[in-house]
UniProtKB/Swiss-Prot annotation:
GO cellular component: a single term: cytosolic large ribosomal subunit
Keyword Hydrolase carried by entry: no
Similarity field: Belongs to the bacterial ribosomal protein bL28 family.
Biological processes per GO annotation: translation
GO molecular function: structural constituent of ribosome
Pfam family, one: Ribosomal_L28
Lineage: Bacteria, Pseudomonadati, Pseudomonadota, Betaproteobacteria, Burkholderiales
Segments of this protein annotated with the region Disordered: 1-25
InterPro entries noted in UniProt: Ribosomal_bL28 (IPR026569), Ribosomal_bL28/bL31-like_sf (IPR034704), Ribosomal_bL28_bact-type (IPR001383), Ribosomal_bL28_sf (IPR037147)
Keywords attached to this entry: Ribonucleoprotein, Ribosomal protein
Entry annotated with the keyword Ribosomal protein: yes
Protein name: Large ribosomal subunit protein bL28
Length: 77
């Protein structure tokens, strides 16, 4: 399963760990993904999503119906 948020599309980024001596080693910055079952009142059912914390906040702000409509328009849900 890919580490990509279904709502925002956030994916892992690459960067560097930088030590005190300024030595650099490659690392990955992973999105804060959560698996959530979210109740959709209009469909009278739960929807299971793998979303980042930013995606959860987006659902709180815009509502699950609006977010699901965007997902379906993109062909993801």
């Amino acid at each position: 399963m890919a580490r990509v948020c279904q709502v925002t599309g956030k994916a892992p980024m690459s960067g560097n760990n930088v030590s005190h001596a300024n030595n650099k080693t490659k690392r990955r910055f992973l999105p804060n993904l959560q698996s959530r079952r979210i109740w959709v009142e209009s469909e009278n059912r739960f929807v299971r999503l793998r979303i980042s914390n930013a995606g959860l906040r987006l659902i709180d702000k815009n509502g699950i119906d609006s977010v699901l409509a965007d997902l379906r328009a993109r062909g993801e849900a």
